[in-house]
């Protein structure tokens, strides 16, 4: 006769511990339970977390450490955080469905293992004029090269994020999707290309994908939690403040840092975070929610014969039309889809003629403010028709120009105010003019931190640093230097900065001169493009100092570039390649490979926009 064994006697918990655990997790969802299991697994992997004398029975842990054969690899290729959020939501959906998934940033993905992937999901954003997210550049380059392997045993799906105000909308997503298919991979689901209002499309895509994968992949048990551990550990330090739940901070300082004669209006902005506990690191960005200019709202309403007091529904809430336009919809960015929809409503011949010529349509949208398009082709619309044209308001991201080692409960940003004229009428950027013109000291401002682990100072404070940041691209390097100063970092620092004029546009001049005097800033090279007959830019200074730049690289220097993605960043990269060819003794192909290796080693990082 065999005596039955109580199930609880097999557990490494006492009855009291089991009761407490059940009470604590009784109201947890399946996703939360999976997250918690992964969190605990991650804890025991950390050195020192197994108590002396404690034993772990192999029989009780075997299932937790067995990696399933068909693991879903989910790659997040994010520039501003949106792709990362979609990927995290998909991961949570898959975990809730008990499907094994490994979420990895594109910058951390060992892309040469792609030939072994069975199930591959990519959420990819596009930056600038069709470029992949900075963290995905190496993966994108590898996949589109001759080195990419056949993927006949791989099934995949791609979700692309972009902005229809740019010509090459969602190009990175299209590139990944098309190339994976070319390499023989099976498409699980048609690619989705989402605009800035991506949430509904993303939710639908996630639901469809989970259904497809549930029919294809065996449901797993504890292995899911083990695979989720990496993501779980990342989330325990997350802030309660986010894009959807921003901090109500205090607007503290608005100081113009360009001279009276400058063609540019650049502001140093300081925001008081109070006792919120909101934390950030050098390299992070500040997300800023803003309101449109009431004068612009009124101008648009009058052109469309609307009063502004019409009741409309926004996210299920009734609002006056004027308030909805002020706080919930983009008014300072025109796009080709908006022009197309407005042409259909207005039946304006000039606008309709653009529809057959995509380049002309895109150019018109980029050059013509929305309100001026309406002025050129006025038509009487209902409030609902107007809102149906517009995109939801999105926050703007600014590279943080301070370190909390110095600024403590403040966050600083450097804002180039967008101002221009269109047919004799003054126009301005939505967020930049909000910060420069419409906020007063002590006003509330809604902000959040967008973390950027792809733009970080070296872990070793003795490592040399080369910083290349013309214009407002200097912002994160102010944060870098504050941090290096506070850390007593012994590594050398070299700044390349450029702007039109020395006397009018030398941003934070006194601070840089102090760092030079104190010896913290080893070198500073300045390029003033309009102070002489021939224009000089930072890329020219890089070539001029190429021999020493190469010596620094050979000594392990980390390279950082911040600023304009469309021209400056490309020109700087060409200059760096020229330096590597000339002083490194390589041909162009070898130089390109060398720079790619620096990127993979996190020694070449860019924050471009």
Swiss-Prot record:
The UniProt keyword set, sorted, is: Amino-acid biosynthesis, Cysteine biosynthesis, Electron transport, FAD, Flavoprotein, FMN, NADP, Oxidoreductase, Transport
Q: State the free-text cofactor note.
A: Binds 1 FAD per subunit. Binds 1 FMN per subunit.
Which residues participate in FAD binding?
332, 366, 396-399, 414-416, 420, 429-432, 609
Q: What GO molecular function annotation could you give as one example from this UniProt entry?
A: sulfite reductase (NADPH) activity
Q: Which GO terms describe its biological process?
A: cysteine biosynthetic process; hydrogen sulfide biosynthetic process; sulfate assimilation
Under InterPro entries, the record lists:
CysJ, CysJ-like_FAD-binding, CysJ_Proteobact, FAD-bd_FR_type, Flavdoxin-like, Flavodoxin/NO_synth, Flavoprot_Pyr_Nucl_cyt_Rdtase, Flavoprotein-like_sf
Boundaries of each FAD-binding FR-type domain copy? 244-458
**Essential cofactor(s):** FAD; FMN
What does the entry list as the binding residues for NADP(+)? Answer: 529-530, 535-539, 571
Q: Which pathway, per its entry?
A: Sulfur metabolism; hydrogen sulfide biosynthesis; hydrogen sulfide from sulfite (NADPH route): step 1/1
Flavoprotein is among the record's keywords: yes
Q: Where are its TM segments located?
A: none
Residue limits of the Flavodoxin-like domain? 72-210
Superkingdom to which the source organism belongs: Bacteria
Q: What is its EC number?
A: 1.8.1.2
Please name the Pfam families in this protein's record: FAD_binding_1, Flavodoxin_1, NAD_binding_1
Residues binding FMN = 78-83, 125-128
GO CC entries: cytosol
Q: What family name appears in the similarity comment?
A: Belongs to the NADPH-dependent sulphite reductase flavoprotein subunit CysJ family. In the N-terminal section; belongs to the flavodoxin family.
The record describes its quaternary structure and partners as: Alpha(8)-beta(8). The alpha component is a flavoprotein, the beta component is a hemoprotein.
UniProt function note: Component of the sulfite reductase complex that catalyzes the 6-electron reduction of sulfite to sulfide. This is one of several activities required for the biosynthesis of L-cysteine from sulfate. The flavoprotein component catalyzes the electron flow from NADPH -> FAD -> FMN to the hemoprotein component.
NCBIfam families noted in UniProt? cysJ (TIGR01931), PRK10953.1 (NF008197)
Output this protein's name.
Sulfite reductase [NADPH] flavoprotein alpha-component
Gene name linked to the record? cysJ
């Amino acid at each position: 006769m065999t005596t039955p064994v109580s199930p609880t006697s097999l557990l490494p918990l006492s009855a009291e511990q089991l009761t407490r655990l059940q009470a604590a997790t009784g109201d947890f969802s399946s996703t939360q339970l999976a997250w918690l299991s992964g969190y605990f697994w991650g804890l025991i992997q950390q050195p020192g977390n197994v108590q002396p004398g404690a034993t772990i029975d192999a029989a009780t842990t075997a299932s937790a450490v067995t990696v399933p054969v068909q693991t879903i690899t989910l790659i997040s290729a994010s520039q501003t955080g949106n792709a990362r959020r979609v990927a995290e939501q998909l991961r949570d959906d898959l975990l809730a469905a008990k499907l094994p998934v490994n979420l990895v940033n594109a910058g951390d993905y060992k892309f040469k293992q792609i030939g072994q992937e069975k199930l591959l999901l990519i959420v990819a954003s596009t930056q600038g004029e069709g470029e992949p997210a900075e963290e995905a550049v190496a993966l994108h380059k590898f996949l589109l090269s001759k080195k990419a392997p056949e993927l006949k045993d791989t099934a995949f799906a791609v979700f692309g994020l972009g902005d229809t105000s740019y010509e090459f909308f969602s190009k990175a997503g299209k590139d990944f999707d098309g190339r994976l298919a070319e390499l023989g991979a099976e498409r699980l689901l048609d690619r989705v290309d989402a605009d800035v209002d991506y949430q509904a499309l993303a939710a639908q895509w996630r639901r469809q994908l989970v259904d497809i994968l549930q029919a294809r992949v065996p449901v797993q048990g504890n292995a899911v939690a083990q695979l989720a551990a990496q993501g779980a550990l990342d989330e325990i330090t997350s802030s309660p403040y986010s894009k959807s739940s921003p901090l109500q901070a205090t607007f503290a300082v608005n100081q113009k840092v360009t001279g009276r004669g400058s063609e540019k209006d650049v502001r140093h902005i300081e925001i008081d975070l109070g006792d919120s506990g909101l934390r950030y690191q050098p390299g992070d960005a500040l997300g800023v929610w803003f309101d449109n200019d009431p004068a612009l709202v009124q101008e648009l309403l009058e052109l469309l014969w609307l009063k502004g007091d019409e009741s409309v529904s926004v996210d299920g809430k009734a609002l006056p039309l004027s308030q909805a336009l002020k706080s919930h919809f983009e008014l300072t960015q025109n796009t080709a889809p908006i022009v197309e929809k407005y042409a259909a409503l207005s039946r304006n011949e000039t606008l309709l003629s653009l529809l057959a010529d995509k380049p002309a349509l895109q150019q018109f949208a980029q050059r013509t403010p929305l309100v001026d398009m309406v002025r050129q082709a006025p038509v009487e619309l209902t409030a609902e028709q107007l809102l149906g044209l517009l995109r939801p308001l999105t926050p703007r991201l600014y590279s943080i120009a301070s370190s909390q080692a110095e600024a403590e409960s403040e966050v600083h940003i450097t804002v180039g105010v967008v101002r221009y004229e269109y047919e004799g009428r003054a126009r301005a950027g939505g967020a930049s003019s909000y910060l420069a013109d419409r906020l007063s000291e002590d006003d509330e401002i809604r902000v959040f931190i967008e973390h950027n682990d792809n733009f970080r100072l070296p872990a070793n404070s003795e490592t040399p640093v080369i910083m290349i940041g013309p214009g407002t691209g200097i912002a994160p390097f102010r944060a870098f230097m504050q941090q290096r100063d506070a850390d007593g970092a012994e590594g050398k620092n070299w700044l390349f900065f450029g702007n039109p004029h020395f006397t009018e546009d030398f941003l934070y001049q006194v601070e840089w001169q102090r760092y030079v005097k104190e010896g913290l800033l080893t070198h500073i090279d300045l390029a003033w493009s309009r102070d002489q007959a021939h224009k000089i830019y930072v890329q020219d200074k890089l070539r001029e100092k190429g021999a020493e730049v190469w010596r620094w690289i050979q000594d392990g220097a980390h390279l950082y570039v911040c600023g304009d993605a469309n021209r400056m960043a490309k020109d700087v990269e060409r200059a760096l390649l020229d330096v590597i060819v000339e002083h490194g003794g390589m041909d162009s192909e070898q130089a390109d490979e060398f720079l790619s290796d620096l990127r993979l080693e996190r020694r070449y990082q860019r924050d471009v926009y």
